Amino acid sequence: MRDFMDYIQLAFYDASKWNRDNSYSQLTTTANALLDFSTPERLKVNLSSLSTPHFATTYTLGTVGLIDGSISYLFTTIPLHDTPSRSTLIPLRKLVPGYRQIYPPSLPPAFPAADGRDGDLAIGGTEGDLKKKATLLHATLHLPPPTTLTGSFLRRLSPTTQLSLAFCSSRAPASKSAPQATLVTQILYDTGKYNSEFLFSTDNALFGFKGLWNFGPDPRKQNQNGGDPAREPCRSLLSLLSAGGEVYYSPVSSVVGLSTGLRFTTLPAATENPHSTFPYTLTLTLTPLTGSMSTTYSLLASPNLAFSSRFGFNVYSWESEMVAGCELWRRSKKLHTLQRNSSPLFAVDDLTWARRKMGLQDAAVSVHSERDDLPGIQRYDHDMHHHTQRPHASDSVIKVRVDQSWNIRALWEGRVKELVVSAGIALGPKSRSSLSYASSLAASGPGAAGGLSSYGWKSVGVSVLYSS
């Protein structure tokens, strides 16, 4: 589950019209959300509030074994009037990342004119907000010692350029020396056709560059021609192929990093009609220096069910990795019955939706025309992209993932009264201590030497969020 501050930061991106999907850093977002989700390891309580449209606070307290906490503050120059802040109103899909629908590349708002001048209108603003830059400030203080202070600064320099500063400062409990600090600076440039990121970190003077290129029509040329072919039915894009890479170099430690990747995904135009393909995303990433490669395949089997798998292989060590996971969104029977009775839009269930994707007829819903069902699919895809609250907001979600070593993680997230609760468990093989191993040999004899590990619980935890 995302932290409340991460949720507010995503709302800032939406309000400033910044496309966070068009980035090499987000190449495997869908697979990571379905396969690499974390489970709570103890009891954690979060109290948050969006006290004004510009200011948010969060207080966190963790317990069980170690008591710690944090205090966070966030300020943005863009008013977040349309952002739900109460825990009972926040759509659960905003707090729980899952399968993410990618949309065709588009121009940032107020894109520079043909003569190269930037638009004067502020991002997300009105005529009275001329020359006002979208800015976000965020700081978090982690207590008790070792005290750590983290923060970030975001500023929209132009419709296509964004500046990001992130710092981390920590100090050991008994140390009298100056706190150690690290500053990471990023400049992001997005034209819709391609995205580039320049990075510098004070830790070992690390320099980095990331880039992503989208194959297909150029949104900049479409803007100059006064049209957008992606919006025309006869020329709608059905899929998107993106290629990118990243490179890092540190002159201090002589460290070099390099990776490249591909992503192929279906677009809404390929899945918005009843007889079409299932939405899916394929990725391939390569790290030549370490000899690692990884492929992922994610499928949206229904509006409430998604599957994902990943296979990794190292050509130097011949080690491999296999991971599979899924997520299932659920709605309460009372809410589901109310939706079915209020509008025919929700009369088509997940099984019927899947049947139509496979081209199978269902007599039970033949009374509804394709035109009646089409807005439902379009509206669903639109909501997945813009994260707007709709009556079909889910009540809970179950996530499960397992790898080739039978490490299993299960997560349930949902609402309990006015709280958003996240509960998870982790199971897997555990190495025995030398003492327990010696005792097992003495009790069972040499024949028990094969039992070097046992299987059991790794962690169990609960996280609770309340916001106002």
Swiss-Prot record:
One of its GO terms (biological process) is mitochondrial outer membrane translocase complex assembly. It is a multi-pass membrane protein. It comes from the Eukaryota. Keywords: Membrane, Mitochondrion, Mitochondrion outer membrane, Transmembrane, Transmembrane beta strand. The gene is MDM10. Lacks alpha-helical transmembrane segments, suggesting that it resides in the membrane via beta-sheet conformations similar to those predicted for other outer membrane proteins and porin. The keyword Transmembrane applies. Belongs to the MDM10 family. Component of the ERMES/MDM complex, which serves as a molecular tether to connect the endoplasmic reticulum and mitochondria. Components of this complex are involved in the control of mitochondrial shape and protein biogenesis and may function in phospholipid exchange. MDM10 is involved in the late assembly steps of the general translocase of the mitochondrial outer membrane (TOM complex). Functions in the TOM40-specific route of the assembly of outer membrane beta-barrel proteins, including the association of TOM40 with the receptor TOM22 and small TOM proteins. This is Mitochondrial distribution and morphology protein 10. The lineage of its organism: Eukaryota, Fungi, Dikarya, Ascomycota, Pezizomycotina. One of its GO terms (cellular component) is ERMES complex. The keyword Mitochondrion applies. It is found in: Mitochondrion outer membrane. Component of the ER-mitochondria encounter structure (ERMES) or MDM complex, composed of MMM1, MDM10, MDM12 and MDM34. Associates with the mitochondrial outer membrane sorting assembly machinery SAM(core) complex. PANTHER family: MITOCHONDRIAL DISTRIBUTION AND MORPHOLOGY PROTEIN 10 (PTHR28035:SF1).
